[in-house]
UniProtKB/Swiss-Prot annotation:
InterPro entries registered for this protein in UniProt: Ribosomal_bS6, Ribosomal_bS6_sf, Ribosomal_S6_plastid/chlpt, Transl_elong_EF1B/ribsomal_bS6
Gene3D superfamilies with a match to the protein in the record: 3.30.70.60
Keywords, in A-Z order: Ribonucleoprotein, Ribosomal protein, RNA-binding, rRNA-binding
Family according to the record: Belongs to the bacterial ribosomal protein bS6 family.
Region ranges (Disordered): 96-124
Cellular component terms per the entry's GO annotation: cytosolic small ribosomal subunit
Gene Ontology molecular function: small ribosomal subunit rRNA binding; structural constituent of ribosome
Name listed for the protein in its UniProt record: Small ribosomal subunit protein bS6
Skewed-composition ranges (Low complexity): 114-124
Biological source species: Burkholderia mallei (strain ATCC 23344)
GO biological process terms, semicolon-separated: translation
Lineage: Bacteria, Pseudomonadati, Pseudomonadota, Betaproteobacteria, Burkholderiales
Domain of life of the organism encoding this protein: Bacteria
Function: Binds together with bS18 to 16S ribosomal RNA.
């Protein structure tokens, strides 16, 4: 089996459906004997360019190990899901299990928001 990194972008109006979508894709992978090494929900982020007149979208990254038939099934699911605006599947040499640079940035932003919220709570 080969290792892949999958990133897909979901319509921002469908953000609440993302956990269910992730579970559906994870069950597809594991039911065919594949493995999931990393799943990262990057949240709603600014797009580099407008897609379908949208400036923001919900990003999800998955690192998996599966065979070609499972990958074909996933790609088919991405193509025919109207909520998925774009998807990218990249073949990797080995499994990536650590946090991605994008996830580190998301964690940094959340830490800044938490630090900014604490002084206002202390003043109240």
């Amino acid at each position: 089996m080969r290792h892949y990194e999958i990133v897909f972008i979901v319509h921002p109006d469908q953000s609440e459906q993302v956990p269910a979508m992730i579970e559906r894709y994870k069950s597809t992978i594991t039911s065919h004997g594949g493995q999931i090494h990393r799943v990262e929900d990057w949240g709603r982020r600014q797009l580099a360019y407008m897609i379908e007149k949208l400036a923001k979208a919900h990003y999800v990254c998955m690192n998996i190990e599966c065979d070609q038939t499972t990958l074909d099934e996933l790609e088919h699911a991405f193509k025919f899901n109207d909520a998925v605006l774009r998807h990218l599947i990249v073949k990797m040499k080995k499994a990536e299990t650590g946090p991605s640079p994008m996830m580190k940035e998301v964690q940094r932003e959340e830490a800044k928001k938490a630090a900014a919220a604490q002084p206002t709570e202390a003043q109240a």
